[in-house]
Amino acid sequence: DPRFQYLHLPVTTGDIVPHCFEDVPNSYLDMVDGQLMHILDTLWSAGRNAIYFCNAGKDRTGVVSALLLQRMGASRQEIVDNYVLSADNLKTMLADFVAKRPELKLEVVTPRAWTMEQFLDRVPDKLRSISQNA
């Protein structure tokens, strides 16, 4: 369909599932690199509606969504609230995912406000580091 342009822009880092929920914000920070900035710039400059997603729709998609919302001027609370919506939306899928992978804990993979708050606290330093190395 010529009305659509498909771009495959994978997040190339941060693919290790943390063992405890306290490590989740750091796993999100690991995703923030030049490739993620390219993804954000591509979505930002699309000039029309865009769909983006990952396998589960909460980690990589959550990080991209948070940074896009931040770029759009959304409040910190709006970003956190948006992220936490995934907990209810993905409840069944996450329970099935954990049931198939006994090494994982539901408390680690469930989106929490604390996770996004910690990520938002730490991401400015990471973004500065990326821009200085560009």
Features from the language model and the residues they span:
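Ser/Thr-glycine-rich phosphate-binding loops at phosphate-binding pockets of nucleotides
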Residues: A56, R60-T61
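Cys-dependent protein tyrosine phosphatase-like superfamily
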Residues: D1-I51, V63-A134
